[in-house]
Regions:
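Non-heme di-metal
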Residues: 1-176
Length: 176
C-alpha cells in the first residue's frame, strides 16, 4: 500500500501508467455521473436533494468532458472501459445492502474526500501543466460534492461506510 504521493511518483514516471491512469479518470467520471444520476430513481429524495444530485451529476459530466479533451490532446482515444472496479466492487454491495439514500451519500462523501487529496496533488504538479489545469478546475466542484454528500448523509452512515471505504482503498493500493 502507498500514499497518494507515492502513487503519483510512480504513475508520473511511466508513459504507459500515465495513459492508463488518464483512461481510468475518464471512465471514472462517466461512471460516477451515471451512478449519481441513478440515485434519483433508486431512492425517495426531497426536491432539494434532487437539485443537489442534478448539480453533482452535471459537474461529473463536465469533468468527463475535460478529461476527454485532455486525452484527445495527448492523442489517446477516450473510451468507457470494461474493467474491474476494484474500489467500487468492495463498496457498492454494501450500498445495495443498506439501501438508503443517506448511506449512498455517506459513500459519496468518503469517495469524493478520497479524491480531494489526489486532485490537490495533481493540480500542484507543474511538470504536467495540462493535467494541473484540468484538476485545478475540477477541485472546487469535488470539494462541493464532498460537502453536499456529507450534508445529505448522517454521521452514523458515514461511520458505517468507513469500513467498506477502507477495504476499497486497500483494493486500489492506497493507505486508508
Amino acid at each position: 500500500m502507498k500514499t497518494t504521493k507515492e502513487w503519483w511518483d510512480k504513475v508520473s514516471k511511466s508513459e504507459d501508467e500515465m495513459v492508463n491512469w488518464l483512461r481510468d479518470q475518464y471512465h471514472g467520471e462517466i461512471t460516477a455521473a451515471k451512478r449519481i444520476a441513478d440515485s434519483k430513481t433508486n431512492y425517495n429524495i426531497s426536491k432539494l436533494e434532487e437539485k443537489l444530485i442534478d448539480s453533482i451529476t452535471k459537474d461529473e459530466y463536465r469533468h468527463a468532458k475535460l478529461v476527454k479533451q485532455l486525452l484527445i490532446s495527448r492523442n489517446i482515444k477516450p473510451e468507457i472501459l470494461t474493467k474491474e472496479e476494484r474500489y467500487w466492487n468492495k463498496v457498492l454491495p454494501n450500498v445495495l445492502e443498506e439501501n438508503t439514500f443517506t448511506y449512498f451519500c455517506a459513500v459519496g462523501h468518503l469517495a469524493e474526500t478520497m479524491r480531494l487529496d489526489r486532485i490537490q496533488l495533481l493540480a500542484s504538479d507543474k511538470r504536467f501543466k495540462d493535467i494541473a489545469e484540468v484538476f485545478m478546475s475540477i477541485y472546487p466542484d469535488e470539494l462541493f460534492h464532498a460537502r453536499a454528500f456529507k450534508e445529505m448523509s448522517t454521521d452514523e452512515d458515514i461511520e458505517k461506510a468507513k469500513k467498506f471505504h477502507n477495504i476499497g482503498m486497500n483494493a486500489i493500493g492506497l493507505l486508508p
